[in-house]
Every structure is written in structure tokens, then in C-alpha cells.
């Protein structure tokens, strides 16, 4: 079993959404954008999903240091999020025989966090 954890300030994601219009398209799939944009506070949802992507990357051992496309990790579903891998991330997961991925996300007023557990 491998675990990845991430914590991010919601204000940081809110600023990225406001300052960099391409941030949404570069980091989130169409389904993720539709979900987040439908929420009362989209920045909280985007921050949770961003933290989720980071946590999954860390649990898979690819973290921030190895290049991958953010959209290669897609987080969908509610209330229990599910993770769909594609592209390079999927290839790396298959090479390492990664099992099922469980993900938990949460947020407070200021922070979003995620914990990913990858089975062996």
C-alpha cells in the first residue's frame, strides 16, 4: 500500500483561477470543470481536486518532480470521488502494478486536503 497526502490553500487556487484563465483548461478535464463550476464556491472544489491530483501523484510515486499532464489524473463522482487515470500517468501506474486508488478529499474555509491510498 502506498499513501499520498496534499494540503493546499484555497486562496492560492482562487488566485490562479482569476489570474490565469488557462489554468482551468490545463489542469482539469471538462467533467471536472463542469462539476467545480456548478458548485456554490468553485475555488473550494477546484482546490480539493488539485490536492487530490497531487496526492494521487505522490501515492503513485510520480509526485511533482516527474512531468505528467494534470488532466491525466481525473477526479469524478460524488459523494465518493473516483480516480480515472490516462496517458503517461496510466502507463506509469501499470508499470508499477498499482492497484485500486482510494481518495478522500475535504476542505475548511481556508484549506483543501486530500489523501490517496494506492493498493499493491
State the predicted function of each range.
Residues 1-120:
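Core catalytic alpha/beta fold that binds nucleotide/phospho-ligands
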Amino acid at each position: 500500500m502506498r499513501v499520498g497526502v496534499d494540503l493546499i490553500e484555497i486562496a492560492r487556487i482562487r488566485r490562479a483561477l482569476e489570474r490565469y484563465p488557462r489554468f482551468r483548461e490545463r489542469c482539469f478535464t471538462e467533467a471536472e470543470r463542469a462539476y467545480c463550476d456548478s458548485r456554490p464556491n468553485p475555488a473550494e472544489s477546484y482546490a480539493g481536486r488539485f490536492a487530490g491530483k497531487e496526492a494521487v501523484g505522490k501515492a503513485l510515486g510520480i509526485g511533482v518532480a516527474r512531468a505528467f499532464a494534470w488532466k491525466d489524473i481525473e477526479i469524478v463522482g460524488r459523494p465518493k470521488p473516483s480516480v480515472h487515470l490516462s496517458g503517461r500517468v496510466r502507463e506509469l501506474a501499470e508499470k508499477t502494478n498499482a492497484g485500486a486508488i482510494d481518495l478522500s478529499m475535504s476542505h475548511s474555509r481556508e484549506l483543501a486536503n486530500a489523501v490517496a491510498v494506492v493498493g499493491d
